Amino acid sequence: VPQEVMLFGGTISDNIASGNPAASKESIYEAAKKANALEFIESFPETFDTLVGERGVKLSGGQRQRIAIARAILKDPSILILDEATSSLDSESENLVQAALNELMKNRTTIIIAHRLSTIREVDCIYVLEDGEIVEKGSHDELALMEDGLYYNLLYNQLSNA
């Protein structure tokens, strides 16, 4: 799930189903529900048949992210890569997207690329990179206690700027 989601011209249903072209309408619906996308999809008069992309409805960043998450849920990958998946979202959208990501990450290996440390607090293991090298490794709680560590300093700076 990338930072900037690309939707192609077509329906919302088509965009979600690109994760699994053989998917049934029921599985597309369930994926949208798990991705916290159902409420906004059902607010459109044509619901899942609403056109998006260049000639269709303009979706917000959070809505596009949730379509991408629904697509990934439908694809059901064994390894998931999240590249700054919540970085450009407002707080309300971030909470909805984060809840959807938590659902998506269940029972699978997930690699998260993140600068916003609040998005990785609950992960099993954090690898901190500096100049392309791993400089720290541990849980959020472990790294947050290392006062001379890079993670600690990043966390401190983010919390003091919040």
Predicted regions and their residues:
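C-terminal portion of ABC ATPase nucleotide-binding domains
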Residues: 34, 43, 99, 116, ...
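Hydrophobic anchor residue at the start of the ABC signature
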Residues: 69, 113
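Conserved D-loop/post-Walker B switch-helix segment of ABC ATPase nucleotide-binding domains
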Residues: 90-100
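A short, proline-enriched helix->beta-strand linker immediately N-terminal to the Walker B motif
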Residues: 74-78, 107
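Catalytic Walker B motif of ABC-type/P-loop ATPase nucleotide-binding domains
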Residues: 80-83
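Conserved catalytic loops of ABC-family nucleotide-binding domains
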Residues: 103-112, 120
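ABC-fold ATPase nucleotide-binding domain signature/coupling loops
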Residues: 38-67, 89, 160-162
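ABC ATPase nucleotide-binding domain helical subdomain, centered on the C-loop/LSGGQ "ABC signature"
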Residues: 13-54, 98, 107, 145
